[in-house]
Regions:
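ABC-family P-loop ATPase nucleotide-binding domain
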Residues: 1-28, 240-245
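ABC family nucleotide-binding domain
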Residues: 18-227, 231-235
Length: 245
C-alpha cells in the first residue's frame, strides 16, 4: 500500500474490485415537512479492496452522514449504493443487519467500549450479540487480535484501566474481529494525543497492508490524511475536486 496521499475525486485510480459504490447519492432531512434540508448532493464514491482512504472536510460538510449511509446506519434519500456488489435499496432490515455485520467494522472517535466487560470480551462483543455466546475458538481469535494490536497482557483488564490509546486499540481489534473487508473509522484519533494518534494510525495501516482490509477514515488531521492512499474532500455536501499538487 502507498502512503503518499494522492488527491482526486471519489473514484479510485485503480481498477480493483469495488467494495462500495455510490452513484448520485443524496440525503435529505425533513421530508414531508415544510422545511426539507438536503445535506448530501449527488455523491459519487467508490472504495476498492485494500484501499486506505481519507475523508476530509469542514464540520457540517456531511462526512458523518455519508459514513452512516455507507455503514447502513441510515438510509439514503435517492441514488444508488452497492455494497459488495449488492444494491442495498431492496434489502429489508434483517438483510441490512446481516450485510453490515459481515462486510463492515466500525471505529469511532469515542471507542464505545462497554465498561463492565474486559478488553477480550469487548473484542468478542459482536459475536456475543449475534450468537449469545463465544466458544474457545472465538476466545483464541480474540486473544490473537489483542496480541496483534499490542495488548496481549491487557486481555482481562476493564477499559477504565487502559489508556485512551489502548482503548482505541481494543476498538480496532473489535472492528476486525469478524474479518470484515471494510472498516469505517470516524475520527479514530481525534480524542488522542499526537503520539497515541500516530500509533493508532500506524496500526490501522499495518492491518491494511498485512490483511488487505480497506479503511475509509474521517479525519481532521492533515498529517494523517497525507499518509493515506487517497483523499476525498467533502464541502457543503458534495465531493470537491482536488487539483494535483
Amino acid at each position: 500500500m502507498g502512503s503518499g496521499g494522492s488527491v482526486g475525486s471519489g473514484v479510485p485510480a485503480t481498477n480493483g474490485q469495488p467494495l462500495i459504490e455510490l452513484a448520485g447519492v443524496r440525503k435529505s432531512y425533513g421530508l414531508g415537512t415544510p422545511v426539507v434540508t438536503e445535506v448530501l448532493h449527488g455523491i459519487d464514491l467508490a472504495v476498492t479492496r485494500g484501499e486506505f482512504v481519507a475523508l476530509i472536510g469542514p464540520s457540517g460538510s456531511g462526512k458523518s452522514t455519508l459514513l452512516n449511509i455507507i455503514g447502513l446506519l441510515e438510509p439514503l434519500t435517492s441514488g444508488e449504493y452497492r455494497l459488495l456488489g449488492q444494491s442495498v435499496a431492496s434489502l429489508g432490515d434483517a438483510e441490512l443487519t446481516r450485510l453490515r455485520s459481515e462486510a463492515i467494522g466500525f471505529v469511532f472517535q469515542f471507542h464505545h467500549l462497554l465498561p463492565a466487560f474486559s478488553a477480550l470480551e469487548n473484542v468478542l462483543m459482536p459475536q456475543l450479540i449475534r450468537t449469545g455466546h463465544f466458544d474457545a475458538a472465538a476466545r483464541e481469535h480474540g486473544l490473537a487480535l489483542l496480541a496483534a494490536v499490542g495488548l496481549a497482557d491487557a486481555a482481562h483488564k476493564k477499559p477504565a484501566h487502559l489508556s485512551g490509546g489502548m482503548q482505541q486499540r481494543v476498538a480496532i481489534a473489535r472492528a476486525l474481529s469478524r474479518g470484515s473487508p471494510l472498516v469505517l473509522a470516524d475520527e479514530p484519533t481525534g480524542n488522542l494525543d499526537t503520539h497515541s494518534a500516530d500509533d493508532v494510525f500506524a496500526l490501522m495501516r499495518r492491518f491494511n497492508a498485512e490483511r488487505g482490509t480497506a479503511f475509509l477514515i474521517v479525519t481532521h488531521d492533515p498529517r494523517l490524511a497525507a499518509r493515506c492512499d487517497r483523499i476525498v474532500e467533502l464541502v457543503d455536501g458534495a465531493i470537491a475536486p482536488r487539483p494535483a499538487a
